[in-house]
């Protein structure tokens, strides 16, 4: 378990006002990390999430904007004096059937890649000098199994997750030994967005009927995987599948 404050390590989790990111923030806080909670829009949810955690900080920032990504990292370091873990969870998608090519407009591509790929990159670059000084710096990118198979809520989303994987491995090969870079690639996870979507209902049923573990994932499943990679000091450049065995099909 991480040490107690004021020397406790600091974790920044982007996109952590709800869903997977919120659960990751809560899990890291339970391990003794001081957590920086972030969102671009859901300010009230972000503030409530941070208020429920010990010595947590909420920062509103849109990491798809370079200045905001830098401000987010700078605010975290100014507040705590250090940064040890970065979890790049902020992301977006559109529910677009893969066959509907015309619906995947250039604007959709720019929106999704701008946050999922460029936003992840900008935040990581801003955080890297601080992570390198940590002595145990770790980056975990939250990706998706859509990055490795013809799946996902849209083609632009799947491509963005392929970018996550490449970014993870290239950075791991570049910034070691000072910083480790890994990723988790979840399958279908039960979040308010997926549970309240007609688009995902048949996909969820297919997962429950066909995958080895016969269930969809929970945010807690992803949070445990993230924590495992943060702890795994001899592991870098890995993309950990958290999909109940869907990749075996």
From Swiss-Prot:
It comes from the Bacteria. Substrate binds at residue 144. GO terms for biological process: antibiotic biosynthetic process. The keyword Iron-sulfur does not apply. Gene3D superfamilies: NAD(P)-binding Rossmann-like Domain. InterPro entries: NAD(P)-bd_dom_sf, SDR_fam. Pfam families: adh_short_C2 (PF13561). One of its GO terms (molecular function) is oxidoreductase activity. Pathway: Antibiotic biosynthesis; granaticin biosynthesis. CDD domains: SDR_c (cd05233). Belongs to the short-chain dehydrogenases/reductases (SDR) family. PANTHER family: OXIDOREDUCTASE, SHORT-CHAIN DEHYDROGENASE/REDUCTASE FAMILY (AFU_ORTHOLOGUE AFUA_5G02870), SHORT-CHAIN DEHYDROGENASE_REDUCTASE FAMILY PROTEIN. This is Granaticin polyketide synthase putative ketoacyl reductase 2. It comes from Streptomyces violaceoruber. The lineage of its organism: Bacteria, Bacillati, Actinomycetota, Actinomycetes, Kitasatosporales.
């Amino acid at each position: 378990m991480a040490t107690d404050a004021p020397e406790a390590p600091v974790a920044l989790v982007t996109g952590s006002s709800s869903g997977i990111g919120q659960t990751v923030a809560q899990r890291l806080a339970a391990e003794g990390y001081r957590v920086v909670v972030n969102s671009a829009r859901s300010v009230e949810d972000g503030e409530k999430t941070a208020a429920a955690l010990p010595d947590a900080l909420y920062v509103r920032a849109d990491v798809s904007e370079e200045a905001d990504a830098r401000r987010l990292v700078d605010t975290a370091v100014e507040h705590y004096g250090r940064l040890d873990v970065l979890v790049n969870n902020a992301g977006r998608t559109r529910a677009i059937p893969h066959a509907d090519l015309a619906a995947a407009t250039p604007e959709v591509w720019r929106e999704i890649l701008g946050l999922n790929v460029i936003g992840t990159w900008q935040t990581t670059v801003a955080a890297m000098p601080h992570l390198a000084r940590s002595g145990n710096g770790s980056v975990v990118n939250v990706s998706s199994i859509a990055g490795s198979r013809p799946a996902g809520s849209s083609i632009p989303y799947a491509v963005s997750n392929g970018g996550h994987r490449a970014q993870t491995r290239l950075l791991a090969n570049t910034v070691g030994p000072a910083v480790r870079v890994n990723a988790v690639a979840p399958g279908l996870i039960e979040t308010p967005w997926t549970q309240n979507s007609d688009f995902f209902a048949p996909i969820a049923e297919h997962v429950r009927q066909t995958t080895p573990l016969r269930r969809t994932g929970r945010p807690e499943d992803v949070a445990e995987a993230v924590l495992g990679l943060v702890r795994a000091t001899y592991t870098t450049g890995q993309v950990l599948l958290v999909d109940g065995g869907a990749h075996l099909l």
